[in-house]
Amino acid sequence: SPSRGLGDVYKRQIAQAIQNKYAQVQKESIPFMESKKETIRHLEADSLSAAVQSNYILRYSSFPVHENTTAEYFQVGDDMFPVLVRELEQAQHYIYIEYFIINDGVMWRTILDILERKASEGVDVRLIYDGFGCLTTLPYHYDRFLKEKGIQCRIFNPFRPLLNIVQNNRDHRKICVIDGHTGFTGGINLADEYINQKKRFGHWKDTAVMLKGEAVWNMTVMFLHMWNVINNSSEPIDHEIHMPHRFHQEPFAGNGFVQPYSDTPLDGEIVGENVYLNIINRARKYVYICTPYLIIDNEMMTALCLAAKSGVDVRIMTPGIPDKKMVFLLTQSYYEQLLEAGVRIYEYQPGFLPVS
């Protein structure tokens, strides 16, 4: 219909405008996002296949690989939360937070108290939340409430019913950066079910990781890119003041390689899926996957089945108690083909498994 055609054109125009702005801020960061030659040499000596993977990520997401970074893994949000609180309390210069879902409760109130206090002490506190992810969890104009507390706030793609043709463009990232040298990411949103203070669909099993060191730079830049895109700001990012060593003069520890990266659906390159396909295709011993929604395309199905048929131990874990029954039925519809290929599938009986 003519109205649908106009809607499609408008949707493409909006998407292109966002992509153009994102490309602009990415271009400004290029001089500050180059991999260290020494790090690349170390990675190539350690694993040539990992170096090839790393080079692809750099070329198509613009985020380099780093050394001198420690990573602490948290099996559940219950373990991550007290560490996050501890690190927020130690912030002296800036706290940048970007989450899909924020919901009032024990977790958010605890964090908000710290953010308000830190802002009053002169710490630069900024928050991005998704307009749809927080549609039913935060009051309308919550950004104004936060501004009164000294917290700068931006909403990614605020929900507008009359413009629903662009409402599928969402910010699912979960990022917290503290003073440029400490970062949290993973699947955990800022809501009580993620720390099992609120029961929804049984035990809530999600994971997170804390990075300390040079790789946090990638997460800082991710946030600053999004901040400028939402602001539609032409003011360039002050990269120098956000460098990891700016507020951490001592050398960082860490023996491995860390490469945080982001992906966007607007540029035509499916970096995230390609990285997973590379990992699966190069697996020699095992592939273990956790996912709340097993909805895979032909390429992913072929890769998983071929790995299992080749003798790789392929295991997939899905929720025992789903949050969306129709989506779970779709998830289960993929079981037969995977099982026939030798993939082992488990359902997490204690509850929901949003970890990916």
What are the language-model segments listed below?
Residues 1-274, 278, 282, 306, ...:
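N-terminal localization/anchoring segments of enzymes in phospholipid and broader phosphate metabolism
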Residues 79, 106, 295, 349-352:
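Short beta->alpha linker loops
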Residues 99, 262, 291-293, 318-321, ...:
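Active-site proximal loops enriched in glycine and acidic residues that flank catalytic Cys/His/Asp
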Residues 190-193, 292, 331:
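Glycine-rich phosphate/pyrophosphate-binding beta-alpha loops
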Residues 273, 280, 301, 314, ...:
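A general structural signal for well-ordered alpha-helical packing
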Residues 293-315, 319, 324:
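Helical hairpin unit composed of two closely spaced alpha helices linked by a short loop
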Residues 324-356:
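C-terminal structural cap/anchor segments
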